[in-house]
A protein has these predicted regions:
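Helix-rich alpha-solenoid scaffolding regions
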Residues: 44-109, 113
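Long, low-complexity, highly charged intrinsically disordered regions
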Residues: 1-62, 80, 188-200, 204-206
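C-terminal transmembrane helix pair
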Residues: 96, 104, 109, 123, ...
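Eukaryotic acidic, Ser/Thr-rich intrinsically disordered low-complexity regions
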Residues: 1, 132-135, 139-145, 149-206
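Flexible helix-coil junctions and inter-repeat linker/turn elements that act as hinges
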Residues: 56-60, 72-78, 95-96, 110-121, ...
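Solenoid-like repeat scaffolds
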Residues: 36-40, 55, 91-94, 128-131, ...
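Positions within ordered alpha-helical repeat solenoids
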Residues: 35, 52, 56, 69-73, ...
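Short sequence/structural elements of tandem HEAT/ARM alpha-solenoid repeats
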Residues: 24-33, 44-49, 62-67, 77-85, ...
């Protein structure tokens, strides 16, 4: 299926993967985007289009994570544009539908795990004063992180142990204690081991 969206001034066409098709679908889509030779402002638009497409899906589609990671690896401005697009999403979470919030939360976890977005993107989050929909968003995001390959989760969150990330580390620890650990223990106890590893990553390295 082809989804065509028209960010000014040129069309950006993304291809959704068919269940019977292979991983070349996101590679093909990334190639098509690259061939558009988008300028700086247009790359920011492309990042927002990616989030919009993902958010509109009925369920999370890994295609967008694979495509986003590949584009971020090739286009620095698009990577920054994606980070800025997420910052805007963080401010508007209370108005987002549950399925949009869930899709974008899972996408963020996948992008962090694939080193497509930096952990520093989370520094703007007010961990001590989250609204209900934001709590849901971050519960979904961290639950998705816990389900990644252990090496991916470690790579995504290891910077929490660095002195420069002390404030973010404190915020994440607060969120884990208030909102993530109770959820895991109640609904997904199979993730307890992964949660313990995440908690270990919040212990500063001397």
């Amino acid at each position: 299926m082809t989804r065509t969206i028209l960010p000014p001034p040129r069309a950006l066409t993304l291809y959704d993967p068919h269940p019977n098709q292979g991983a070349e679908d996101y590679v093909d889509a990334a190639t098509r985007v690259t061939k558009l030779r988008l300028q700086r402002g247009q790359q920011a638009d492309a990042a927002r289009v990616l989030l919009e497409c993902c958010g509109q899906e009925g369920v999370f589609n890994l295609f967008y994570a694979l495509l986003g990671a590949r584009l971020c690896g090739c286009h620095r401005e698009l990577k920054f544009g994606l980070q800025c697009a997420y910052w805007d999403e963080f401010k508007q979470l209370e108005g987002a539908s549950l399925h949009r919030a869930a899709n974008l939360a899972k996408l963020l976890a996948q992008l962090l795990g694939r080193a497509a977005l930096p952990l520093a993107a989370l520094r703007v989050v007010p961990w001590g004063s989250l609204e209900p929909r934001a709590v849901f968003f971050w519960q979904v995001c961290f639950t998705e992180l816990l389900q990644l390959e252990p090496a991916m989760m470690r790579a995504a969150m290891a910077q929490l142990q660095e002195p420069a990330f002390a404030e973010l580390r404190d915020g994440v620890m607060l969120f884990i204690g208030r909102h993530l650990r109770p959820l895991v223990l109640k609904k997904t106890p199979a993730l307890s081991e992964a949660l313990a590893e995440l908690v270990a990553l919040t212990i500063p390295v001397d």
